[in-house]
Amino acid sequence: MVGTQAEKELLELVKPIVAAMGFQLVELGLHRSPNGSRVHVVIYRAEGVGVDDCAALSRNLRPRLELAAGLGEVGLEVSSPGLERVIKDPAEYEIFKGRGVRLWLRDAADWLDGVNEGVEDGALGLSRGGQRLRFGLEQIVKAKLDAS
């Protein structure tokens, strides 16, 4: 989710605020330019995330971000993960546990659909047609949420 020291510091600031408002932090991005900084926050809640939720979090985060040292002028974007989000980090399997997913496995000829059962011992559990399948994370080339 984060790589640079600035992103780690930003994560420490943002994550507790997101959690206190009842959301899970899915993604946090920081993009700097000579004109200021742009922060992108993706949040999730099983009951869904609406425009009002994003606006409320934005109102709560913006003043804190503006006070954060070194960010300069801050642009803030808060959004939901979307219906068919590409899963970018193994931690997202836990966030989206119980949701439908589509997997593209190494040497596969087509997408494999099922219900995400989370990661255990480095393998993703997938319910499909009454069966529970397991795939090592290294086998998964691409994964995304399935809105169908």
What are these regions (language model features)?
Residues M1-D113, E117-S148:
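Short Lys/Arg-rich amphipathic alpha-helical segments
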